[in-house]
């Protein structure tokens, strides 16, 4: 990561495993819904592929420098937007300004805030149709215990 001038902070962990990337993309590519919200796109490890399979794409990135970089990279695509926001406290109803109807939430969530982010979106009246997220094993086990 140092060679790419990346300095993970804020609990970030950057997705580099090609097998995991493929699993995530395969999980959403055949769905009828093509509105995709990506939480924490970071350097854009799966962003291109998500954009290729979506009608509307919105990325929420907390790191201002990464958000600016991604916004510049995709500025010519009118169906792609990035917001510099904290997904854990983001007003989910604002999504309707960018994604007009049902959406799928995809993300490689920061460990320290994954619970807060997931709860923010599933407790909203504008819930995602599906979540395809990578989270810490202990957080996943905690969700399973509550079901």
What is the predicted function of each stretch?
Residues 1-147:
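Catalytic cores of RNA-modifying enzymes
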């Amino acid at each position: 990561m140092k060679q790419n001038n990346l300095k993970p902070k804020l609990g970030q962990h950057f997705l580099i495993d090609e097998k995991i990337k493929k699993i995530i993309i395969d999980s959403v590519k055949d769905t009828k819904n093509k509105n995709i919200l990506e939480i924490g796109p970071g350097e854009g490890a799966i962003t291109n592929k998500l954009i290729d399979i979506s009608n509307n794409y919105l990325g929420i990135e907390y790191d201002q420098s990464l958000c600016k970089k991604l916004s510049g990279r995709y500025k010519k695509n009118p169906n792609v937007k990035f917001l510099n926001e904290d997904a854990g406290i983001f007003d989910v109803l604002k999504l309707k300004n960018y994604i007009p109807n049902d959406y799928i939430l995809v993300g490689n969530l920061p460990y320290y805030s994954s619970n807060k982010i997931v709860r923010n979106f599933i407790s909203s009246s504008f819930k995602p149709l599906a979540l395809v997220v990578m989270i810490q094993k202990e957080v996943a086990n905690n969700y399973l215990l509550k079901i």
